[in-house]
């Protein structure tokens, strides 16, 4: 079994360990999420969910902080780096500290640089991954942050979503598809962005991500029978109309929603960690179908370190 698959399948076990961790957000403080790649996408989702629930939050790439020394006004910066060694994030942490902002590092590595330089750190070393691609640890960290707003037992629900994901995706003839599109609003746009990244990283595919109703305004011109459109839906009527329109044009749709082909529970947006499971598994399956090793994608390393 590949490391990537193993790290996806162990997600329910990872989530079971959340009971040992506590992280609470306050509406009296403003938060800034900082990260690169998947960690930035994670911060984007968390920031969006916080804003939707009356909290003040922003998100920025570590590289932007490193290059331009500009930081949105905030009380607490949450720096996410799976390895704790990503150059841009480590340098961003030091810059942010120089601005007098409290820093919290979230990582899956013991004794990492980010945990040493941050004012506080959350170390989820039981979720450390051997694969280059971030999967289970992404779901875990996002669930930790979600529980900082509202508490949920994601472990049992994740088993259901994982079973549904493997059952549905295993039936797809992925060799038919050469173009992948991910659609979603609000926090689901962040999931779509991450879904696109998973297909790029693991399976080297041509991908797009958009808000659903924006898709008709140009991007739909590339739609063919070789396109798979993944809709992270909020189960509204207009998204359902779009799904039918896409199918009429010959493409295939895969809906992840409360009533979709892959079902997730309705937690008013807080189910968001569970929506990552099917897109991660889809990336893995497409990589295998293409004959690629999802554990070690081309041109990528587990941690980006700049000279």
What label would you give each PLM region?
Residues 178, 182-254, 262-263:
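Acidic catalytic cores of enzymes that act on phosphate-bearing nucleotides/polynucleotides
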Residues 23-159, 165-166, 185, 228-262, ...:
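Glycine-rich phosphate-binding loops that contact phosphosugars or nucleotide phosphates
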Residues 15, 160-168, 207-217:
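A general structural motif
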Residues 264-293:
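Structured C-terminal subdomain patch of bacterial secreted/periplasmic proteins
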Residues 1-14, 104, 129-137, 268-277:
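A cross-family phosphate/adenosyl-ligand binding-site feature
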Residues 1-29, 162-164:
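An N-terminal, well-structured beta->alpha segment
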Residues 17-31, 168-177, 223:
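Glycine-rich phosphate/diphosphate-binding loops that line cofactor/substrate pockets in enzymes
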Residues 290-307:
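A short, charged, Gly/Pro-tolerant segment at domain boundaries
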């Amino acid at each position: 079994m590949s490391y990537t698959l193993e790290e996806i399948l162990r997600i329910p076990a990872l989530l079971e360990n959340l009971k040992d961790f506590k992280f609470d957000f306050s509406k009296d403080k403003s938060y800034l999420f900082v990260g690169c790649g998947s960690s930035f996408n994670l911060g984007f989702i968390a920031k969006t969910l916080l804003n939707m629930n009356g909290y003040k939050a922003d998100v920025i790439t570590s590289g932007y902080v490193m290059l331009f020394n500009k930081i949105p006004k905030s009380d607490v910066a949450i720096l996410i780096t799976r390895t704790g060694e990503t150059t841009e994030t480590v340098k961003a942490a030091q810059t942010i500290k120089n601005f007098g902002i409290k820093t919290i590092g979230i990582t899956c590595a013991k004794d990492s640089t980010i945990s040493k330089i941050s004012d506080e750190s959350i170390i989820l070393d039981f979720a450390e991954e051997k694969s280059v691609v971030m999967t289970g640890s992404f779901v875990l960290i996002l669930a930790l942050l979600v529980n900082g707003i509202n508490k949920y037992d994601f472990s049992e629900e994740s088993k259901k979503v994982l079973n549904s994901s493997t059952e549905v995706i295993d039936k797809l003839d992925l060799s038919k598809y050469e173009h992948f599109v991910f659609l979603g609003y609000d926090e689901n746009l962040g999931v779509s962005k991450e879904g696109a990244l998973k297909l790029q990283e693991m399976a080297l595919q041509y991908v797009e991500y958009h808000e659903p109703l924006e898709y008709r305004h140009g991007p739909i011109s590339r739609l063919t029978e070789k396109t798979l459109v993944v809709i992270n839906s909020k189960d509204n009527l207009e998204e359902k109309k779009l799904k039918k329109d896409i199918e009429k044009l010959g493409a295939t749709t895969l809906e992840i929603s409360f009533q979709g082909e892959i079902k997730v529970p309705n937690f008013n947006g807080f189910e968001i960690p569970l929506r990552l499971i099917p897109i991660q598994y889809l990336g893995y399956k497409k990589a295998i179908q293409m004959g690629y090793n999802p554990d070690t994608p081309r041109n990528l390393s587990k941690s980006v370190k700049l000279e």
